[in-house]
From Swiss-Prot:
Cofactor note: Binds 1 zinc ion.
GO molecular function terms listed in the Swiss-Prot or TrEMBL record: metalloendopeptidase activity; RNA endonuclease activity; zinc ion binding
Pfam families (alphabetical): YbeY
Enzyme Commission number(s) of this protein: 3.1.-.-
Protein name: Endoribonuclease YbeY
Protein location: Cytoplasm
Cytoplasm keyword on record: yes
GO biological process: one example: rRNA processing
Top-level EC class as recorded in UniProt: hydrolase
Keyword flag rRNA processing: yes
Cofactor: Zn(2+)
Task performed by this protein: Single strand-specific metallo-endoribonuclease involved in late-stage 70S ribosome quality control and in maturation of the 3' terminus of the 16S rRNA.
Species whose genome carries this gene: Caldanaerobacter subterraneus subsp. tengcongensis (strain DSM 15242 / JCM 11007 / NBRC 100824 / MB4)
Residues where Zn(2+) binds: 124, 128, 134
């Protein structure tokens, strides 16, 4: 597993978050039984930058907590024949963009730690990169169950 982290904001102290994000990504991959070597890029931004990204990519002119940018359908990795796979190959599965400013606001609003919020947003986004969504009630319920399992694995239950 290769995790690239880029802190592109200065409004919120990001000390210690890199290790937490790596743990959250690893726990999600383990829970989903992903055995392939994957690469994930994570960017920490402020509300203004995520608002611009949200407007550009989704047509929504407001800040949000996290955006997920899958680079491929995860099934593409799983479906390759074993003899065609390079054992050393690392599959870039996507990018995660987290507004630390929004995460801090939400942690205060929900009454839990900033670290728990960042871990949750990372897990949520990882599930999107792995092909999950929450467009329907059924999808939302499944995704929520998976999020809770990973958060429990991390010792960060509600």
């Amino acid at each position: 597993m290769n995790v690239l982290i880029d802190n592109r904001q200065t409004k919120v102290d990001a000390s210690g978050l890199e290790a937490l994000v790596v743990r959250a990504i690893k726990a999600t991959l383990e829970e989903e039984e992903v055995v392939d070597e994957v690469e994930v890029s994570v960017s920490f931004v402020d509300n203004e930058e995520i608002r611009k990204l949200n407007k550009y990519y989704r047509g929504i002119d407001s800040s949000t907590d996290v955006l997920s940018f899958p680079l491929m359908e995860f099934e593409e990795i799983e479906e390759g024949e074993e003899d065609e796979k390079d054992a050393e190959e690392i599959y870039p599965i996507g990018d995660i963009v987290i507004s630390l400013e929004k995460a801090k606001e939400q942690a205060e609003e929900y009454g839990h730690s900033f670290e728990r919020e960042v871990a949750y947003l990372t897990v949520h986004s990882m599930l999107h990169l792995l092909g999950y969504d929450h467009e329907t009630e059924e999808e939302r319920k499944l995704m929520r169950e998976k999020e809770e399992k990973v958060m429990e694995r991390l010792g960060l239950r509600r």
